Regions:
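PDZ-domain C-terminal substructure recognizer with occasional recognition of PDZ-binding tails
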Residues: 214-256, 354-373, 377-380, 389
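C-terminal, low-ordered peptide segments at domain boundaries
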Residues: 232-285, 385-392
Length: 392
C-alpha cells in the first residue's frame, strides 16, 4: 500500500474555501457564520485544555533550586562573648512543589535543573499533612542537634535532661514471613501522636532514654495501652497508645530522640525553611560565633548535611539543586555529606559527581562524614583554626 500523506485539520466541511463572495467580492453571511463557529469551538478547546492542565493534579513532587541564607547573621549567641564572621556560611534550600498540576509537571520535564520525584517516595507512605509536620519537626531537631554538637566540639559539657522527643511516627511495620510474604502491621502511635511531641513520662514513670520507654512497652500485653504523658504546644496531656505485637518484640510505633540541657542560649533564625539538611551549616555557624577569628576565611562557604549530637554528618536529598544555588551565591567551597558504605552508595556518588559538574571547576566540593572533617576543610581553605575538643 502506498504511503498516504497525513491529513491536516482544517475548517469545518460546511465552511466554503475559498470563501464565496458576492458581486462585490465580500464574504457571504454563511461564510462568516461558519468561521465564527470554528473560532469559538477552537477557543473552547483551548480553554478546556488549559483548565485541565491547571486543575488536574498528578502524584509527583518537584524540587527546583532555591536559594541561600547566610547563617552568620541568623545565629545569635546570648550571655557569652561572640565573634561575628566576615564571610558567609550559606544554608542551601530547594523549592518543593507538592502534588503538582500537569503544566508544572511538563515544565519540570523540560528543565534540567528540576527534579521530579513520586509523591509516595517523598512522604514515605504518610499523608501530606504528616509530611509537612515532620519537615518542621526535622528543622527543630536539627537546630537542637546543632547546638549540642557545636558546644561539645568546643569542650562544653551538655548533659541530657528528662523526657524524650518524638522525631518519627512510621505508619506501619513491615516484615517478611518465612515463605517470603510481606506483612504490614499498622502502628497506633501514628494516629495519636505528632512529630516533636515531648514524652514526659509513661505509666507514671519519668523517661531519660529510649530504653526506658521500650522496657515499659514490652511489659504490656498486646492490645493493652501505655499511658503516655506528653507535652504539646505548651500543654500537657495523657494519651493512651495501644501496644502491638511484631515478630520478636512489642511496639507502639515511635522514633525518639533524647533531650539536652544546653548551657548557652543560642537563637537560630531559618525563616520558614524546614527539613533536616541545614544541621551541619548551623553547627559551623554556632562555632564561628563562639570562637575568635573567621572560620570562613572571609569566603562564601556553602554547606549541606544533617548533624547528630555527636557530630556525625548524614546524607541529604536534592544535592544537585543545592549545587545550583551554591554556584549562584558565589560559593568558593561546597561542603557536602560523604557517602556511607551501604546499598545507597552508588546513587550517592552519582549525586556528588553531578553536583561537581553543576558548580564547575572554580568551586571545591568537599565530602565529609564528621564535624571535625568539615572544620579541617575550612582550615585548609584559609579559615581560622578552632581549638576544639577533637583537635586538642
Amino acid at each position: 500500500m502506498a504511503d498516504q500523506e497525513p491529513s491536516v485539520p482544517g475548517p469545518p466541511a460546511d465552511l466554503e474555501w475559498p470563501p464565496e463572495s458576492g458581486d462585490s467580492g465580500a464574504p457571504t453571511s454563511r461564510t462568516i457564520a461558519g468561521w465564527v463557529k470554528w473560532v469559538i469551538a477552537a477557543g473552547v478547546v483551548v480553554v478546556v485544555v488549559a483548565l485541565a492542565g491547571t486543575i488536574i493534579r498528578v502524584p509527583y513532587d518537584t524540587f527546583a533550586p532555591g536559594g541561600t541564607l547566610n547563617l552568620e547573621s541568623r545565629v545569635a549567641v546570648k550571655d557569652v562573648k561572640s565573634y561575628p564572621g566576615r564571610g558567609a556560611l550559606l544554608l542551601l534550600f530547594v523549592r518543593e512543589r507538592t502534588h503538582v498540576n500537569l503544566w508544572s509537571l511538563l515544565q519540570a520535564k523540560l528543565d534540567s535543573d528540576i527534579d521530579i520525584v513520586k509523591q509516595d517516595k517523598v512522604t514515605g507512605g504518610t499523608s501530606q499533612r504528616y509530611a509537612d509536620q515532620q519537615a518542621v519537626c526535622d528543622m527543630t531537631q536539627s537546630q537542637n542537634s546543632a547546638r549540642v554538637a557545636a558546644l561539645r566540639e568546643l569542650g562544653y559539657k551538655v548533659p541530657t535532661s528528662p523526657g524524650l522527643d518524638v522525631i518519627g511516627l512510621p505508619p506501619t511495620y513491615s516484615y517478611k514471613t518465612a515463605d517470603g510474604v510481606v506483612k504490614n502491621i499498622k502502628l497506633p502511635a501514628y494516629n495519636l501522636l505528632r512529630p516533636c511531641d515531648e514524652i514526659v513520662g509513661a505509666d507514671g514513670h519519668t523517661l531519660e532514654q529510649n530504653a526506658d520507654l521500650s522496657k515499659i512497652v514490652k511489659s504490656h500485653k498486646p492490645g493493652t495501652s501505655v499511658a503516655l504523658r506528653i507535652a504539646r504546644d505548651g500543654q500537657e496531656q495523657t494519651v493512651e497508645v495501644p501496644v502491638v505485637a511484631v515478630p520478636g518484640t512489642r511496639l507502639v510505633g515511635v522514633s525518639l530522640a533524647r533531650r539536652y540541657k544546653v548551657p548557652v542560649r543560642i537563637d537560630i533564625d531559618t525563616s520558614d525553611i524546614s527539613g533536616p539538611s541545614a544541621g551541619l551549616a548551623m553547627t559551623l555557624a554556632i562555632i564561628d560565633q563562639l570562637t575568635p577569628g573567621d572560620l570562613t576565611g572571609g569566603k562564601n562557604i556553602a554547606v549541606t548535611g544533617t548533624i547528630d549530637p555527636n557530630g556525625n554528618v548524614g546524607e541529604i536529598g536534592a544535592l544537585e539543586q543545592k549545587a545550583v544555588a551554591a554556584r549562584a551565591a558565589g560559593a568558593k567551597v561546597f561542603i557536602v555529606p560523604a557517602c556511607a558504605k551501604d546499598s545507597g552508595r552508588a546513587a550517592c556518588l552519582k549525586d556528588i559527581a553531578a553536583a561537581k559538574k553543576r558548580v564547575g571547576g572554580d568551586v571545591l566540593v568537599a565530602p565529609v562524614s564528621t564535624l571535625a572533617q568539615a572544620l579541617q576543610v575550612l582550615r585548609e581553605a584559609g579559615g581560622a583554626p578552632v581549638r576544639s575538643s577533637s583537635s586538642a
